Amino acid sequence: MSGGQNLQAKAEIARAIKAAINALTLETKEGMIEAHGTILGALEQAEQAQLAPEQIILFCMLGDLYFSTKKFETAHSAYTDAIHIEGAIRNPKVHYRLGKTNYHLENLDRAADELARAYMGAGKDIFANDGGIYFEFLKTRLKPPPKGW
């Protein structure tokens, strides 16, 4: 794909991401269905254009959509797809998402591993919006760092 086509694909994907976010803010079944379709369409474009960062974002958005409806197996699958994309292995947010889904699927050893990777990559701040559940769980599985939590 040429540079111009890549830029066009990126612009279309950015519009799709914005549309999906807007649909999700409706917090209705219709909004969820619309967001799902929009994300899948954008993901197809990102895959065709071989845009790894956009693929990671879209797989995570898809996983977040499933996670929000407690479809943890399907969310886990989307996050697993994300982590296998070039560059994602270094992304603590993807590890955090995998850790959360593994926690809810009761794969606790794997949850601890993924949450530890998230913690090492982003620090305690990555747990700021989860009510403490995942960080408290992680603290039961790791020794405290030398300077404390």
What annotation goes with each model-predicted range?
Residues 12, 31, 50-54, 74, ...:
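Structural signature of alpha-solenoid helical repeat junctions
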Residues 26-29, 69, 105:
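Structural motif corresponding to the intra-repeat A-B loop/turn of tetratricopeptide repeats
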Residues 2-6, 43-52, 83-88, 125:
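Flexible helix-coil transition and linker loops at the boundaries of alpha-helical arrays
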Residues 12, 16-19, 59, 95:
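TPR repeat positional signature
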Residues 49-51, 87-93, 120-134:
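Boundary/linker segments of alpha-helical solenoid repeat arrays
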Residues 103-126:
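TPR/TPR-like (Sel1-like) alpha-helical repeat modules
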